[in-house]
Curated annotation (Swiss-Prot):
This is Pyruvate kinase. Allosterically activated by AMP and by several sugar phosphates. Belongs to type II PK. Mg(2+) binds at residues 225, 252. ATP binds at residues 38-41, 77, 160. K(+) binds at residues 38, 40, 70.
Amino acid sequence: MIRRFRRTKIVATLGPSTDNHIILENMIKSGVNVFRLNFSHGTREEHIYRAKLVTSIAKRLNCHIALLGDLQGPKIRICKFQDKKVFLKVNNYFILDANLNENLGTSERVGIDYKNLPKDVKKCDILLLDDGKIQLKVINIVDQEIFTKIIIGGVLSNNKGINKLGGGLSARILTKKDKRDIITSIDIGVDYLAVSFPRYGSDLDHARKCAVKFGSKAKIIAKIERAEAVKDLKIIDEIILASDAIMVARGDLGVEIGESELAGIQKTLIRRARQLNRVVITATQMMESMINNPMPTRAEVMDVANAVLDGSDAVMLSAETASGKYPIETIKVMSKVCMGAEKMPSINVSQHRIHDKFHDIEEAIAMSAMYAANHLSGITAIITMTESGKTSLMTSRITSGLPIFALSSHIQTLKLTALYRGVTPIFFNSSKEGVSAANEVINLLVKRGFLEPGNLVIITQGDIMGKVGKTNTSRILKV
């Protein structure tokens, strides 16, 4: 019997907790498919060191692990307090002062790093600090000072983020730091580049042009975290189509749109991304308690399982692996939860694009192969022989319980497919074509233990090997 694979991929964030090569190796063995470099933290040298460590271990283990560079973006923050933190009392007044020295904050006022904030707010706006833990109501704006009344108080420490309820902050999509980090990401050779806080599709177009100008070949991920980005379905689709993948970044997004709206928006984003043939990652606090505990809460287990059932390509861990005490255990638990959720039959039925026109021959072949696989009894696997990974992506848009094997001679392509739901990347290089190449692939998969004699498989390939966009054939073969 063909062995069962976990279909949902796991993205883990690198950090101090993963700097040990033994821990990193065990994380890969436990199920990590993509490692994230969070450019909001750490130095250029640290990121390069961690990326090299991942690459060397993955090469030794003969597995294809993708690297994801995550740009900080225009995160709007307060500056620093003289005493590092202050206590804000409800009904007291507090000033956000764009002219104040960045280190001279007090319990009465604090500086802000985004100097145009006074122009972006108006009376009665609600400003959310530290992910909404502190809430301020704007009562007046005078020049560069924003006068507020404290609605929800508490301890406020240095450099906490500022959001506006309902969105409306107009900071530019790429900062000077982001541009420096893009250069670092090129030196590292990341496969994916995540763009933070896009509000419209044009923001992604701008980010892509900038990255390409610097020489980046990375695929672009849109991090959905602004209220404007989910204002209506038209804007959602515009952002999805302008990117190669999206990340449902539930932290800032939940703060801006309100926690009560988050679950519905998550489901909408995942559904639309899959319908538009894009990859989708669900992120933020998925197993937050495992930063300090060896076991997750039941609510966290349900959250991960729900993201799987929604159809996420990947679920992501942040501080749980970057700075947590139990990075390996977290990966193991998340992997088990994903596999448990994938047993549910609800995710094995798909109507993907059944009523839509196909855009090209590759998509037509991929869709026909997957529908045949889901409706012909006895199919055990789908094999895509691919140059760019596009056919593998298309087949992975139709949910099924069947493994998809992406075979390519291009390491970059194999790393990209590491993020696709249900796809297992395998290196394959041959001068053969047609049925001869297909038979060689089958022999390789049997040798690797992925297939057994008697299995029925579907193979997609092109008549001409080695050229992008030439997939035009689907075969059903018996091993």
